[in-house]
């Protein structure tokens, strides 16, 4: 056979997008994406896409903590305290961070506490140290009164059991890793393939092996380019030894690489020359699906499935290799759920309009965590304290509020925003939900929506606002706050989901009630039923149920399924003060497959929540 006849020219070039789409379809048929999932230590999971939805299993914090250095007190003892009329308290102990004071304090007593220290069981406020003065080894003068719960981080104020910590396909940014660690989680499932890189070519010499290659030889350089670019993604990369242009050696190198890796990259041997053997090996070993891309440089690119694994052949010329990696290989890996961080900066800086008023701290620039919604450049700052790592991890940006502004930043004002991570393409805006309802919603969207989801669980008024601006793809709104929904009917499809709300009470050390954000239906109800009681702020029914169960509050407002959980766990039956029938309106943008979303959502409601939620079609 002549040299000419042994060549196999590349005749049919494929568009990059078509090649990627075709490969994804073929790889999905063999369950390839699932094979890329690895359970790894949190330290190894940074910047990876999570392969599971993780719900909070404990409250954070799980005990009352001080958020300042000062003195834990009974707020009742300081009602009359002022600069002119200080109150003398007896100092009965000290608690450092990491410690817990297990004894109750008596009338007129206090305990010194560090920031983060646990409070005595019946302490209900903390006086900052700057408002006090020592009057002896066991005496403290207090020059200010404090309110119930002031400077206290209540249990579940950051995360409650059943909260979503990470949604499947979320990129595990550093703050999300910290939120997982705060749950006691040390390992997590992520998409993190093992990749082997094999340079080929009889002409190649390993850098450092000789002072200068002999004529005809060159230093191998492309593997350094390939490895360093791939390592901007969530992968484990190993580079093999240089393989000469010998069919048997290439076959053996492929066999070795397939044993321990999910994906194999060959460099070189992909063109039509007599010594280009990689494409011949792939043709005989598996299914060669791509041979030639319609790009320059980079035409001689290969892709094959061998032993149910992905093998890619890159051109040998380094510039071609670079172009194919950026235009084809890395986009293909991203479609396989492998996250790449190729931008030069972790943060991007934009200006956006405030969805709600915002207030800077007095005398300081305030960097407030927020939800950035890039569909129309809006930003929604959240209420938070600096210990709230879970709340922080659920946002995707920070708003800068400059010091020196008197009063509030008004709605619609442009503010500088630092956005971190990738843009969220699918917006879910929701009323605060029970743990079971939340799980039903998340399970539905995980199974159907193949986009990055931003879950904004900030109450019905926020959800309605985002729906009116056509920002929310899914909005879940309480019937008590759903005025004006008719105007959205041409843009959203909808269903109604019935839920029963109960106001319950029990005996507790303090007559206190959970107070919800005013943006939620729970806030409206708590305004009515918590009058005359001390107030403990909560965000969700999940947090309220935990505090009620543990006796931190004597009254709360819950969806009935959370009450069932309280009764079954504690064995006592709370007193029902009132029952309220409510309906959640679930809105779905008409450009989505709402029929499928609603069908799956209702099935999940039925399987997760039992008979407590009854779906009704609008």
Question: Predicted regions: what is each one?
Answer:
Residues 2-17, 186-314, 318-328, 443, ...:
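Helix-rich terminal scaffold detector
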Residues 2-16, 71-244, 255, 377-386, ...:
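Short, glycine/charged-enriched hinge/interface segments at domain edges or termini
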Residues 13, 17-20, 32-43, 47, ...:
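Flexible glycine/proline-rich
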Residues 242, 452-459, 531-544:
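Short beta-strand-to-loop elements that line the ligand-binding cleft
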Residues 381-385, 391-396, 403-471, 511, ...:
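N-terminal hydrophobic or amphipathic helices and topogenic motifs
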Residues 426-432, 506-528:
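Short loop->beta-strand "edge-of-pocket" segments that line small-molecule binding or catalytic clefts
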Residues 445-513, 541, 557-563:
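N-terminal segment of the mature folded domain
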Residues 496-501, 568-600:
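Periplasmic-binding protein-like
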């Amino acid at each position: 056979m002549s040299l000419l006849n042994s060549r196999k020219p590349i005749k049919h070039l494929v568009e990059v997008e078509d090649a990627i789409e075709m490969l994804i379809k073929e790889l999905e048929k063999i369950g390839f994406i699932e094979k890329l999932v690895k359970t790894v230590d949190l330290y190894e999971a940074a910047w990876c896409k999570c392969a599971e939805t993780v719900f909070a299993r404990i409250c954070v914090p799980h005990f009352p903590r001080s958020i300042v250095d000062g003195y834990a007190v009974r707020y009742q003892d300081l009602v009359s305290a002022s600069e002119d009329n200080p109150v003398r308290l007896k100092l009965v102990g000290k608690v450092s961070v990491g410690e817990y004071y297990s004894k109750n304090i008596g009338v007129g007593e206090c305990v010194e506490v560090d920031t983060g220290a646990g409070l005595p069981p019946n302490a209900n406020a903390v006086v900052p140290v700057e408002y006090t003065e020592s009057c002896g080894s066991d005496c403290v003068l207090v020059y200010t009164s404090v309110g119930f719960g002031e400077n206290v981080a209540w249990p579940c104020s950051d995360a409650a059991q059943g909260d979503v910590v990470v949604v499947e396909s979320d990129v595990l940014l550093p703050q999300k890793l910290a939120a997982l660690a705060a749950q006691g989680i040390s390992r997590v499932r992520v998409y993190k393939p093992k990749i082997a890189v094999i340079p080929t070519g009889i002409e190649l010499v390993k850098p450092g092996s000789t002072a200068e290659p002999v004529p005809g030889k060159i230093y191998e350089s492309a593997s350094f380019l390939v490895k360093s670019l791939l390592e901007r993604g969530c992968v484990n990369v190993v580079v093999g030894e240089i393989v000469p242009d010998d069919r048997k050696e290439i076959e053996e190198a492929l066999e070795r690489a397939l044993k321990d890796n999910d994906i194999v990259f060959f460099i070189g041997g992909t063109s039509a020359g007599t010594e280009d053997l990689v494409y011949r090996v792939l043709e005989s070993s598996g299914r060669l699906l791509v041979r030639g891309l319609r790009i320059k440089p980079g035409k001689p690119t290969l892709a094959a499935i061998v032993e149910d694994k992905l093998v890619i052949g890159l051109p040998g010329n380094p510039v071609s290799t670079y172009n194919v990696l950026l235009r084809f290989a890395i986009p293909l890996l991203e479609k396989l759920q492998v996250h790449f961080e190729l931008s030069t900066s972790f943060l991007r800086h934009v200006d956006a309009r405030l969805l709600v008023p915002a207030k800077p701290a007095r005398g300081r620039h305030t960097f407030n965590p927020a939800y950035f919604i890039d569909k129309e450049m809006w930003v929604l700052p959240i209420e938070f304290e600096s210990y709230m790592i879970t709340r922080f991890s659920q946002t995707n940006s920070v708003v800068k509020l400059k010091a020196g502004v008197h009063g509030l930043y008004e709605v619609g004002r442009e503010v500088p925003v630092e956005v971190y991570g990738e843009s969220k393409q699918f917006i879910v805006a929701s009323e605060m939900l029970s743990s079971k309802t939340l799980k039903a919603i998340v399970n539905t969207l995980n199974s159907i929506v193949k986009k990055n989801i931003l879950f904004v669980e900030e109450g019905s008024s926020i959800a309605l606002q985002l729906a009116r601006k056509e920002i929310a793809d899914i909005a879940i709104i309480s019937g008590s706050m759903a005025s004006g929904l008719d105007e959205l009917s041409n843009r959203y499809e909808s269903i109604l989901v019935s839920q029963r709300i109960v106001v319950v009470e029990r005996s507790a050390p303090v007559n206190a009630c959970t107070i919800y954000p005013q943006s939620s239906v729970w806030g409206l109800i708590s305004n009515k039923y918590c009058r005359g009681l001390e107030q403990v702020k909560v965000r969700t029914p999940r947090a309220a149920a935990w505090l009620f169960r543990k006796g931190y509050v004597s009254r709360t407002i819950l969806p009935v399924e959370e009450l069932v959980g309280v009764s079954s766990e504690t064995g006592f039956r709370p007193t029902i003060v009132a029952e309220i029938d409510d309906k959640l309106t679930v809105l779905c943008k008409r450009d989505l497959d709402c029929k499928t979303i609603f069908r799956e959502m209702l099935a999940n409601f039925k399987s997760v929540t039992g008979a407590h939620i009854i779906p009704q079609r609008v």
